[in-house]
């Protein structure tokens, strides 16, 4: 029989450590909360320095208004804040923080040092270990605050055991800072990672220059600016050209009142505006900043404030769609400046960056079996054979015999083949996708050939994708996809399996990188390959179907359906030619 335990109040340290579990997930969360404090302090120069992806050390320096010596002990108490006085103030916020939880939460699970000074006063240095103030003494310091966080999660080892890799945290910090670069104006940003300058933005750089820095030249070339206001909603941003799209929503940047926000609702509204301009299952790339009345927004939804409730959601959604449709209909002359044009101005020079323009995806395959498909005269077949001969190597022109299967002819999206069972129709796109999937399975990889490319493919990617490819490059090489890094966000593909086209390979690799992570193990990577390959679109208009692929298909049991359930092969029956 269990004994009754008395109800008691938790001590302040335990309360703060529990709160830290909601607010502070990792080093990225620490950087986020501290730079938001800097922004709320009115800083226009913010420097972030990290070691070990922030797991070793985090240092945030700013030139904000600073702390008075007597304010620091109060600020380290939970729910101490200068942002609000009562609950109703939450709905008229002009600050990023308001709960008064971040600083005490971080202090309770780390060894922290705060150096701060207000204008015209001596600085103060305060050392805190596990939420307890160890020392507080005067120090020489200019206006502003420096917060140093060491030994994160040192007193909660269970939390430390769940941390991701340092590389993953570096990636998260980069994404966080890039979002802040886009969301803020007249604020300089600097990030030093492992002793190297990773990001440097001057406060005088304007919005378009910041977009060019984060999103890259390729995005800016044909991008359109938007700045419209209606019904209390202001929409500002840069819209990618309809020809610039991606297989996932990665690359979509959304801000509400200068807060980075994740909103599927807004993303879908933007997608609706592009709907008639994009191939199926492709997503636009954009930077969109919404400015709404404070009373319309509730940011007190998610512990990390990455979501928002919008009071007049449908009105806002309609405004977004209408504004973007109108902008996309603008004459081509109203375009953003390219990076080259920006460099030729007197602005601070920007580094070359990234992003990939993928080719248009062909329409979905929907070939219905029809007896008209076989209504070819001998002359038609002869002409088809001549056309096939003119565009393929000699070894692929003649009728090919093997002990199992004989190639008959190619009819655009399908191939006809014959074996002892009869004549088969082969749906080439589904067949190639299935063979490519089998080639990725390591136990089958020796059956499939890779081809070295005469001119290597260039793949321009985001930093997130670059981390993935640099981490899993060896695995991809083992599977016949030789990929190497030739720039910060540029990769070169030197060889590929023969059954996949160049643009198909690019699309699939981007899908894989978007869904994967640097920490994924080999078993999970295999499952992810299958999942993303199912989503990828293989061209239905491949001009030459290599007959060696047909022999491969028979060698694996001439399956009727692929790994994804798509129809690969069908035996033509006599009943197909009989009148109903």
From Swiss-Prot:
One of its GO terms (molecular function) is ATP-dependent DNA damage sensor activity. Keywords: DNA damage, DNA repair. Pfam families: DNA_mis_repair, HATPase_c_3, MutL_C. One of its GO terms (biological process) is mismatch repair. GO terms for cellular component: mismatch repair complex. SUPFAM superfamilies: ATPase domain of HSP90 chaperone/DNA topoisomerase II/histidine kinase (SSF55874), DNA mismatch repair protein MutL (SSF118116), Ribosomal protein S5 domain 2-like (SSF54211). The keyword Cytoplasm does not apply. This protein is involved in the repair of mismatches in DNA. It is required for dam-dependent methyl-directed DNA mismatch repair. May act as a 'molecular matchmaker', a protein that promotes the formation of a stable complex between two or more DNA-binding proteins in an ATP-dependent manner without itself being part of a final effector complex. Belongs to the DNA mismatch repair MutL/HexB family. NCBIfam families: mutl, PRK00095.2-5. This is DNA mismatch repair protein MutL. It comes from Chlamydia pneumoniae. The lineage of its organism: Bacteria, Pseudomonadati, Chlamydiota, Chlamydiia, Chlamydiales.
């Amino acid at each position: 029989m269990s004994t009754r335990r008395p109800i008691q109040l938790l001590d302040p340290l335990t309360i703060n450590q529990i709160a830290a579990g909601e607010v502070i997930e990792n080093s990225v969360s620490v950087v986020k909360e501290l730079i938001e404090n800097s922004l709320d302090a009115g800083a226009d120069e913010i420097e972030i320095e990290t070691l070990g992806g922030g797991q070793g050390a985090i240092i945030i320096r700013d030139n904000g208004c600073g702390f008075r010596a007597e304010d620091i002990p109060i600020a380290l108490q939970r729910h101490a804040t200068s942002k609000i006085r009562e609950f109703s103030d939450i709905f008229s916020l002009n600050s990023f923080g308001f709960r008064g939880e971040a600083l005490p939460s971080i202090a309770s699970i780390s060894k922290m040092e705060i150096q701060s000074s207000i204008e015209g006063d001596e600085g103060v240095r305060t050392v805190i270990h596990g939420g307890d103030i160890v020392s507080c003494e005067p120090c020489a310091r200019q206006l502003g605050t420096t917060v140093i966080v060491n030994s994160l999660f040192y007193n909660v080892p269970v939390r430390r055991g769940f941390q991701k890799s340092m590389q993953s945290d570096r990636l998260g910090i980069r994404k966080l800072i890039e979002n802040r670069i886009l969301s803020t104006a007249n604020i300089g940003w600097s990030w030093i990672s492992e002793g190297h300058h990773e990001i440097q933005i001057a406060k005088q750089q304007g919005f378009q220059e910041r977009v060019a820095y984060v999103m890259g030249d390729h995005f800016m070339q044909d991008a359109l600016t938007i700045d419209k206001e209606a019904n209390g909603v202001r929409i500002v941003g840069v819209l990618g050209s309809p020809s610039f799209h991606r297989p996932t929503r990665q690359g979509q940047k959304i801000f509400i009142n200068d807060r980075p926000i994740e909103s599927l609702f807004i993303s879908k509204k933007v997608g609706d505006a592009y709907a008639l301009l994009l191939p199926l299952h492709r997503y636009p790339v954009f930077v969109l900043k919404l400015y709404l009345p404070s009373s319309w927004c509730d940011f007190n939804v998610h512990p990390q404030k990455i979501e928002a409730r919008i009071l007049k959601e449908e009105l806002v959604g309609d405004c977004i769609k209408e504004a973007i449709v109108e902008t996309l209909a603008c004459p081509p002359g109203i375009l953003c400046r390219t990076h080259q044009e920006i460099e030729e101005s007197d602005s601070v020079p920007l580094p070359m960056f990234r992003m990939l323009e993928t080719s248009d995806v062909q329409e979905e395959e929907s070939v219905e079996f029809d007896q008209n498909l076989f209504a070819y005269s001998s002359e038609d077949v002869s002409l088809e054979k001549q056309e096939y001969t003119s565009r393929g190597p000699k070894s692929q022109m003649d009728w090919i015999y093997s002990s199992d299967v004989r190639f008959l002819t190619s009819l655009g999206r399908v191939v006809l083949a014959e074996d002892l069972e009869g004549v088969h129709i082969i749906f080439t796109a589904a067949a190639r996708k299935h063979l490519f999937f089998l080639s990725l399975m390591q136990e089958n990889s020796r059956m499939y050939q890779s081809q070295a490319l005469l001119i290597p493919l260039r793949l321009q990617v985001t930093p997130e994708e670059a981390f993935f490819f640099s981490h899993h490059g060896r695995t991809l090489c083992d599977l016949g996809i030789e990929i190497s890094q030739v720039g910060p966000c540029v990769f070169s593909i030197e060889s590929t399996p023969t059954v996949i086209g160049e643009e198909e390979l690019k699309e699939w690799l981007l899908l894989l990188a978007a869904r994967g992570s640097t920490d994924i193990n080999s078993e999970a990577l295999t499952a992810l390959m299958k999942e993303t390959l199912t989503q990828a679109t293989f061209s239905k208009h491949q001009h030459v179907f290599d007959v060696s692929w047909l022999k491969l298909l028979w060698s694996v049991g001439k399956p009727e359906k692929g790994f994804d359930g798509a129809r690969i092969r069908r035996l033509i029956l006599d009943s197909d030619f009989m009148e109903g």
